[in-house]
Swiss-Prot record:
It comes from the Bacteria. Its EC number is 1.1.1.18. Involved in the oxidation of myo-inositol (MI) to 2-keto-myo-inositol (2KMI or 2-inosose). It comes from Paenarthrobacter aurescens (strain TC1). Belongs to the Gfo/Idh/MocA family. Keywords: NAD, Oxidoreductase. GO terms for molecular function: inositol 2-dehydrogenase (NAD+) activity; nucleotide binding. This is Inositol 2-dehydrogenase 1.
């Protein structure tokens, strides 16, 4: 059995660079063997100071490198599908940043390819499942400590959006995390999505309606709502309140130092997702490595990637129509049950 994962990180942009640093400094049982980027200079800069790592310009070079036995995909989503097929052919353990692929049709093809392999090889990077507060709330739900879960209320707020962040990206790039969180908390599929567009902020760029209110329902009737507000200015905030038969649980509050000075009181707001979920990323990658070294794959699966893609498609349709849209899912293969 493999004692060390020799990982090819494909994509050396913001997320890829963060994972390269993580693998080379904080993760046990894994090493960076190769970094791939179309900008070879960026790949070379990313491996500086990492022993035995090579910079490459193509995923094929990395996958055929005899020193590589695992793959972490951090490229833009539209490039994932081809890399996933080739990594599955090698039977490598794969950690794929979300999305699995950009649409449900191609994601389903990846699910079928993995199913044909006969065992799971893909973990999808929904890192919130590994956050300590998310894990704690999940345990409360699973153990029925407060009775049955009835409703979920989510807030997802960003200080601003980069240039080119479209209306559809509020669903595909942001609410996608809540889609997975709701499925994680309830253990159920989301059956319908509705999007309501209210009064927009003046800070929203042209062509973007912000904020939006997303309403969802699960198989057992759990209702969930998401406030997505991506130009909130004040900082980054991801919070959830869960309503049970016998109580309420809230997670995601900023609980840093509370300061009183010079006639003022208060604390600091988390500036971005790296600060809020940095520890969760570490736990996520370590869990992937530990499972891969046992010959297993844990965490969010290719099915989870497919199901969230289907939710996103329903969400974008609901954005445009204003109607409640049914989430269309194929039958779940036995491999993921």
């Amino acid at each position: 059995m493999t004692k060390t994962l020799r990982v090819a990180v494909i994509g050396a942009g913001r997320m890829g660079a963060d994972h390269i640093k993580r693998l080379s400094t904080r993760i046990h049982g894994a090493e960076v063997a190769a970094v791939v980027d179309v900008d070879l200079a960026r790949a070379q800069a990313a491996i500086e100071g990492i022993d035995r790592a090579v910079a490459l310009a193509s995923a094929d070079e990395a996958l055929n490198n005899g020193d590589v036995n695992a793959v972490l995909i951090a490229t833009p989503g539209f490039l994932h599908e081809e890399i996933l097929y080739k990594a599955l052919e090698k039977d490598f353990p794969i950690l794929c940043e979300k999305p699995l692929t950009p649409d449900a049709g191609s994601a389903w093809k990846v699910v079928q390819a993995e199913q044909a392999l006969g065992h799971k090889r893909i973990q999808v990077g929904f890192m919130r499942r590994f956050d300590a507060e998310y894990s704690a709330l999940g345990a409360i739900i699973r153990n029925s400590e407060l009775g049955e879960l009835l409703m979920l209320h989510h807030q997802h707020r960003n200080p601003s959006t980069p240039e080119g962040f479209t209306n559809e990206m509020l669903i595909n790039d942001s609410v996608v995390h809540e889609f997975d969180a709701i499925r994680f908390f309830t253990g159920e599929e989301i059956t319908s999505v509705q999007v309501r567009l209210g009064k927009p902020t003046r800070s929203a760029p042209s062509g973007q309606h912000d904020p939006q209110h997303v309403l969802l329902e699960t198989e057992s009737g759990v209702l969930a709502d998401v406030e997505i507000y991506v130009n909130a200015k004040f900082g980054y905030q991801v919070a959830t309140q869960a309503s049970f038969e016998e109580g309420i649980v809230s997670i995601g509050s900023d609980n840093g130092p509370y300061v009183q000075t010079a006639g003022k009181w208060g604390g600091n707001v988390t500036p971005g997702f790296e600060e809020r979920f940095g520890a969760a990323y570490d736990v996520e990658v370590q869990a992937w490595v530990d499972a891969a070294l046992r010959g297993e794959i844990g965490g969010p699966t290719a099915w989870d990637g497919y199901a969230t893609a289907a939710c996103c498609e329903a969400g974008v349709e609901a954005q445009k129509s204003g109607e409640k849209v049914k989430v269309q899912l194929n039958t779940k293969p036995d491999l993921y049950k």
